[in-house]
Amino acid sequence: MNRLRSFLFHLSFFTSTFLYMLVMVPFLPLMPRRFMWKLIVLVWAHTTIFLLRTVAGVRMEVKGRENILPGPLLIAAKHQSAWETIALLPLFEDPAFILKRELMWIPLFGWYVAKARFIPIDRGARSAALKTMTERAQLEIAKGRQILIFPEGTRRPVGAPPSYKFGVAHLYGSLGAPCLPVALNSGLYWPRKGPLRPGTVRVEILPPIPANLPRGVFMARVERDIEAATARLVAQGRAELGEDPTGGAAEPPLERGSPAA
């Protein structure tokens, strides 16, 4: 049953995404970016969340919304699944996602990403990528936007050892903005491999880390805060799925070496 529901979700997700982008693309050059964000990006995100709930049985629960600060902010989120690249969009005010450059090359999709002024990085050019990412993030945050980064740079399987990259500390030190850690357990329900599983993805928006801490202190704190909360959410999710809350052996990491997270 899970495989059937997963297939139907993916079919409806990719079909609706393609058709919506195709219908709206003639109007894309004429739209102000903020209008495009509300009309296209947020509608797409809410539609996908609806499909996840009604077709795949994947619900969501968010705690800690009161910790979201207005104005310039660096958001550092755990990355286990494709889920958070969609479902986190409506939670924040006009966030600029930091993402891998290759996503910009996808026909149609890349045009919308460019219009949203997300920040692409070339993960093969480490020092140049850090410089470009920082400059772009500084420009966007000066306009009052919030920057969202995945500190490990890529999806990590549930239970895999953390692999936080220096890029998040570099960005934090350069922006001079507080950092909002975000923990989640989405990898239990939308894994990279295998079917989606019904259940409740839990997101916890943690208390913000103040700006201008020493980078080493910040790096230790952001990893500690995210990983401790994620471990608790994963254990809760596993218990709800009827699994051992302590988990088994972790899958091997999927990728390594992102300069930006």
Name these PLM-found stretches.
Residues 1-61, 260-261:
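N-terminal membrane-anchoring alpha-helices
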Residues 3-4, 130-261:
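Non-catalytic C-terminal accessory region of glycerolipid acyltransferases
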Residues 20-42, 53-55, 69-126:
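Catalytic core of membrane glycerolipid acyltransferases/transacylases, capturing the structured
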Residues 52-53, 113, 140, 172:
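A generic structural signal for well-ordered alpha-helical segments
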Residues 62, 119-122, 211:
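Short acidic-hydrophobic, aromatic-tinged amphipathic segments that line or gate anion-handling sites
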Residues 62, 75, 97-98, 203-205:
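Generic preference for hydrophobic
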Residues 64-68:
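Glycine-rich helix-loop-beta junction characteristic of Rossmann-like nucleotide cofactor-binding loops
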